Every structure is written in C-alpha cells, then in structure tokens.
Amino acid sequence: MNRTVFCTFLQREAEGLDFQLYPGELGKRIFNEISKEAWRQWMSKQTMLINEKKLSTMNPEDRKLLEQEMTKFLFEGHDIQIDGYTPPEK
C-alpha cells in the first residue's frame, strides 16, 4: 500500500516517498512532508543547478548551497533562478 502525505510543496495529499532520501532532521521533514512528485521536481531543478553552476556534490560549500536551495524550493515556495536559462515555451 502506498504511503500518502500532505505535501507542503503541492499543498495537497499525494504519494509519499518510500524511504528517507536525505539525512538528518531535514531528511525526516522531507520524508514526512514532501511527495514523490515534488521530490522529482526538485531533482530536476537540482540537476540544472549542478550543471549550470558547475557544482560538485563532493565540495562542502556546493552541498550547502544545494541544501539551501532545496529548502527554499520545497518549503518556502521559491523557484530556482539560473542566469541565462529560458524555460521552453508550452
């Protein structure tokens, strides 16, 4: 049976993550408050950030930046802004 959560990002009930994907207290919060759909959206944004800003997940400063951006995106409603990126037209 799938686990459902009230997703803070989507502001509705949605399928929850299968397990805690991120360590610590923030990871617990993500597991309890973020849906699979919202997590997929974050992963897409994170990939863009890593590629466009040439970040390394091995660099502690880059990991800190990614964590800050993740928190702003998932819990504070801030979209990721990447200089020079224009989203495709629908």
UniProtKB/Swiss-Prot annotation:
Pfam families (UniProt xref): Iron_traffic
InterPro entries associated with the record: Fe_traffick_prot_YggX, Fe_traffick_prot_YggX_sf
One annotated Gene Ontology cellular component of this protein: cytosol
Single Gene Ontology MF annotation: iron ion binding
Domain of life: Bacteria
Tagged with keyword Repeat: no
Keyword Iron among record annotations: yes
GO BP: any one term: cellular response to oxidative stress
SUPFAM superfamilies documented for this protein: YggX-like
Alphabetical UniProt keywords: Iron
SUBUNIT field: Monomer.
HAMAP family: Fe_traffic_YggX
Family that this chain belongs to: Belongs to the Fe(2+)-trafficking protein family.
Role of this protein: Could be a mediator in iron transactions between iron acquisition and iron-requiring processes, such as synthesis and/or repair of Fe-S clusters in biosynthetic enzymes.
Name of the protein in question: Probable Fe(2+)-trafficking protein
Annotated organism of origin: Photorhabdus laumondii subsp. laumondii (strain DSM 15139 / CIP 105565 / TT01)
